[in-house]
Amino acid sequence: MNKKPIILGIESSCDETAASIITENEQGMPTILSSIVSSQVDVHKEFGGVVPELAARSHMEKIDLITKKAFDKSGVKMEDLDAIAATAGPGLMVCLSVGLSFGKAMASSLNKPFIAVNHLEGHALSPKLNSELNYPYLLLLISGGHTQFLSVQGLGNYKRLGTTIDDAVGEAFDKTAKLLGIEFPGGPQIEVYAKKGDPNKYELPKPIFHKGGCNLSFAGLKTAVLKISKQIKTEQEKYDLAASFQKTIEEILYKKSKIAFEEFKKMNTINKNKFVVAGGVAANKRIREVLTNLCKEEEFEAIFPPINLCGDNAAMIAMVGLEKFKLKQFSELDSPAKPRWPLDADAAFLKGAGVRL
């Protein structure tokens, strides 16, 4: 019987310190043996956002303990590992360096292969941890730092169909939460507030809604929320603004996803089209519901990671490591951290005030 590979994943790109050990079952499906995530909410709460230097210090203080917990829960010994995978980017440079250095040191001391992982590729492959997923598929990556549509042709082969030209959708959620006085991290609480509000109370803008293909924009929406928030006097008005904001995001993602479906079908001729939605914002239940309904209308299969694997975690990093290990795609121990590391390196850089669509 062939030994199944055992991979350790390390994640420290922003404000979660995470370690995970995964393997495969007899059917070749990934199996999570352990997944430990330590959040830094209490560290950054008083500042209303992530402070890079404090985040890096917290990573350095916790990474040993978090990794030990991953080993303890999995029952795996260090010498049983087949490879160590660590996030190398994109993310905050000072934070990336902690996990990357830790992973390299482990690989060197154990004489095991090291695999530098693109954090975004981790999100892209995260649904493979709980479902069979073959290439190609359409990916909507929605998080605090990224919002983009990609045709996933294979491991390491991504074709960007559309992206935000300014802010990420997760950032818009976080900014709206802050304006409503919701304690950090407030983005996920918008959905809770929205349930108590009238989604038709405020008419909010949907930038580049009728142009730009499946590119997106959220800066104008954020500005509108800022203006309205200054006039709010009651809790109910906060709920109404949250509900109106949530509804606007749903409408934008519905419309732009529908356009992306057509672009994807032009590139790929397959029997069953699949639509993967991943990243922290994919945990939003209303967005899941709206995009699932769209998939039913357009005959796409909707695929989401489990809620606990939508945010940053190391299981998805180990998942990429597992795929790369099987292809013997190893990295050098001097692999650098990459604060910016697009999945589609050939795609034009769209972000910036000079973009005209």
UniProtKB/Swiss-Prot annotation:
Substrate binds at residues 141-145, 174, 187, 284. It catalyses: L-threonylcarbamoyladenylate + adenosine(37) in tRNA = N(6)-L-threonylcarbamoyladenosine(37) in tRNA + AMP + H(+). One of its GO terms (cellular component) is cytoplasm. It is an enzyme of class 2 (transferase). CDD domains: ASKHA_NBD_TsaD_bac (cd24133). The keyword Transcription does not apply. It holds the Pfam family TsaD. Its cofactor is Fe(2+). It is found in: Cytoplasm. Fe cation binds at residues 119, 123, 312. Keywords: Acyltransferase, Cytoplasm, Iron, Metal-binding, Transferase, tRNA processing. GO terms for molecular function: iron ion binding; N(6)-L-threonylcarbamoyladenine synthase activity. The keyword DNA repair does not apply. Its main location: cytoplasm. PROSITE patterns: GLYCOPROTEASE (PS01016). It comes from the Bacteria. Binds 1 Fe(2+) ion per subunit. InterPro entries: ATPase_NBD (IPR043129), Gcp-like_dom (IPR000905), KAE1/TsaD (IPR017861), Peptidase_M22_CS (IPR017860), TsaD (IPR022450). GO terms for biological process: tRNA threonylcarbamoyladenosine modification. Its EC number is 2.3.1.234. Belongs to the KAE1 / TsaD family. Required for the formation of a threonylcarbamoyl group on adenosine at position 37 (t(6)A37) in tRNAs that read codons beginning with adenine. Is involved in the transfer of the threonylcarbamoyl moiety of threonylcarbamoyl-AMP (TC-AMP) to the N6 group of A37, together with TsaE and TsaB. TsaD likely plays a direct catalytic role in this reaction. This is tRNA N6-adenosine threonylcarbamoyltransferase. It comes from Pelagibacter ubique (strain HTCC1062). The lineage of its organism: Bacteria, Pseudomonadati, Pseudomonadota, Alphaproteobacteria, Candidatus Pelagibacterales.
